[in-house]
C-alpha cells in the first residue's frame, strides 16, 4: 500500500516537472511554441527569420529590424486508451475527450542594425487528463490538470565578419513565472468506497535558467544553428488531502514539497536555401533526461502509511525514475509564392524518442516514441501583417506497460490533433 500511495503523489509531481512533456497521458514535447514553427514541426533552430526564434534559437533575433510581434495558440486534442489489465482482461478504457488551448506571444525590437532584444511568453504546460472513475489505473490518476507559464527575455548580436561568414550570437533567460497542478485518484488498498486522494500545488518561486545559441552562415544559402537550453531547478509545494481513508494511516491532509533539476537540451540544425523560394531544415535535438534518476518528496506531517526503515518519521520518500537521454529528429520545408502572391506553404516530419523506461512507466505519463506530421501556411494580408496557420498530427507507438512496477499493466494507445492559428506583425 505504501508504494501505491507514493506513486499517486510522485506521478502528480512528475507532471509539473517533466520539462519536455505536456501534461496529458502521452507526454507531448513543448516544441509547439509557435504557429509558424509548427508548420515545420519545430525544425526552426537555424531558420532565424521570425520572432519566435527567441524560443528555438535566440541568435536569430539579430536578423530582425524594427518591431516584430507574433501571437497565436495551439488547440491540443489528445485521445488515449488503455487495454487491460493484462493478462486477466482485454477490456478497453478510454480517456475522456478534452481539448486544451495553449497560447504564445513574441515581441522584438531592433535596437541597432546588429543588436536586437525581445521577449517571449508561452505556456508549454496547460493540459490535463481525465480517466473513468473506475478503471485499472485509478490508483494513479482519475483527473489531472496543469498550467505553467514561462517568460523568455533574450538579446542577440551580429558579429563583424572574420572569415566564417555571417555569425550571430544570442542568449536569454527562461523563467517559469507561474504554475498550478491538480490531481485526484483512489487508494483501492482500503475497502472504503469513494476514498479519494486529492493534490493541489503551485510553483513555490520563479524557476530560472537560460538559453543561448549561435548561427553561422558561411554562404548565403547555408545556415548552421546550435542552441543550448540549460537545466532548471524548480521548487514545488502543495497540499495533499485524504478523504475517507483510515486516520491511523493518513492524516486529513498535509503539505508536500520537492525540488528537481530539469534536464538540459542541445540542438544542432542545418538550414539550406535550395531555391529562392524553397528552404529546407533538419534539426537534431538531444535531451539530457539521464539527470532525472530519482525524485525525493518531503511531507510537512508524518504520514503513518509511509513509515519505513528508509523513512522512519514518515515524512520523506524517494522514487526511482531512471529516465534515459532522448533525442528528436525534426525536418521541415518552406515554399513561398505557391501560385498565390503572399502565400507560403510549410510541411514537416519528426521522430520523437521517449525517455521513460519500461519499469517506471505509469498512467499519468505513459510516454512512447512518436511520429509527427505537419502542414502549415502563412498569408501576407499586407506587407506588414500575416496570418499563420498549422496542423500537426501525432501518432504514438503502442506502449506495453507489463514490465512496469508502477502499474497498471496493459497497453496504451495515443494520438493527437494539434491545429494552431496566429498572426505576425512587422513595423
Give the label of every model feature segment.
Residues 78-80:
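A generic, lipid-embedded transmembrane alpha helix
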Residues 1-9:
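Positively charged n-region of N-terminal signal peptides that target proteins for export
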Residues 50-76:
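N-terminal, post-signal-peptide region of Sec/Tat-exported proteins
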Residues 24-41, 45, 66, 82-92, ...:
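Outer-membrane beta-barrel porins/channels
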Amino acid at each position: 500500500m505504501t508504494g501505491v500511495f507514493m506513486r499517486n503523489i510522485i506521478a502528480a509531481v512528475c507532471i509539473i516537472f517533466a520539462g519536455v512533456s505536456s501534461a496529458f497521458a502521452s507526454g507531448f514535447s513543448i516544441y509547439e511554441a509557435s504557429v509558424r514553427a509548427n508548420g515545420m514541426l519545430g525544425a526552426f533552430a537555424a531558420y532565424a527569420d521570425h520572432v519566435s526564434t527567441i524560443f528555438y534559437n535566440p541568435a536569430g533575433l539579430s536578423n530582425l529590424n524594427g518591431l516584430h510581434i507574433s501571437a497565436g495558440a495551439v488547440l491540443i486534442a489528445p485521445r488515449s486508451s488503455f487495454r487491460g489489465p493484462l493478462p486477466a482482461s482485454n477490456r478497453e478504457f478510454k480517456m475522456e475527450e478534452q481539448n486544451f488551448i495553449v497560447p504564445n506571444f513574441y515581441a522584438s525590437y531592433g535596437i541597432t542594425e546588429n543588436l536586437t532584444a525581445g521577449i517571449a511568453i508561452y505556456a508549454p504546460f496547460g493540459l490535463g487528463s481525465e480517466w473513468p472513475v473506475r478503471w485499472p489505473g485509478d490508483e494513479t490518476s482519475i483527473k489531472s490538470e496543469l498550467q505553467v507559464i514561462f517568460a523568455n527575455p533574450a538579446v542577440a548580436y551580429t558579429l563583424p565578419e572574420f572569415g566564417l561568414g555571417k555569425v550571430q550570437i544570442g542568449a536569454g533567460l527562461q523563467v517559469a513565472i507561474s504554475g498550478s497542478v491538480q490531481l485526484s485518484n483512489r487508494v483501492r488498498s482500503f475497502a472504503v468506497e469513494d476514498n479519494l486522494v486529492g493534490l493541489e500545488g503551485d510553483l513555490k518561486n520563479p524557476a530560472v535558467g537560460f538559453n543561448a545559441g549561435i548561427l553561422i552562415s558561411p554562404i548565403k544559402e547555408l545556415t548552421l544553428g546550435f542552441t543550448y537550453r540549460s537545466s532548471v531547478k524548480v521548487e514545488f509545494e502543495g497540499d495533499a488531502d485524504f478523504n475517507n481513508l483510515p486516520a491511523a494511516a493518513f492524516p486529513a491532509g498535509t503539505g508536500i514539497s520537492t525540488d528537481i533539476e530539469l534536464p538540459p537540451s542541445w540542438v544542432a540544425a542545418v538550414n539550406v536555401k535550395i531555391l529562392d523560394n524553397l528552404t529546407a531544415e533538419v534539426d537534431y535535438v538531444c535531451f539530457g533526461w539521464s539527470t532525472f534518476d530519482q525524485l525525493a518528496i518531503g511531507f510537512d506531517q508524518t504520514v503513518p502509511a509511509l513509515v519505513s526503515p528508509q523513512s522512519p518519521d514518515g515524512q520523506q520518500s524517494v522514487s526511482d525514475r531512471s529516465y534515459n537521454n532522448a533525442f528528436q529528429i525534426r525536418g521541415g520545408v518552406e515554399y513561398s509564392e505557391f501560385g498565390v502572391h503572399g502565400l507560403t506553404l510549410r510541411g514537416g516530419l519528426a521522430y520523437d524518442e521517449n525517455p521513460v523506461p519500461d519499469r517506471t512507466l505509469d498512467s499519468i505519463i505513459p510516454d512512447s516514441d512518436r511520429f509527427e506530421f505537419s502542414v502549415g501556411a502563412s498569408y501576407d494580408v499586407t506587407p506588414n501583417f500575416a496570418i499563420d496557420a498549422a496542423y500537426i498530427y501525432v501518432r504514438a507507438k503502442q506502449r506495453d506497460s507489463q514490465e512496469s512496477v508502477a502499474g497498471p499493466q496493459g497497453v496504451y494507445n495515443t494520438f493527437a490533433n494539434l491545429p494552431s492559428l496566429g498572426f505576425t506583425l512587422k513595423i
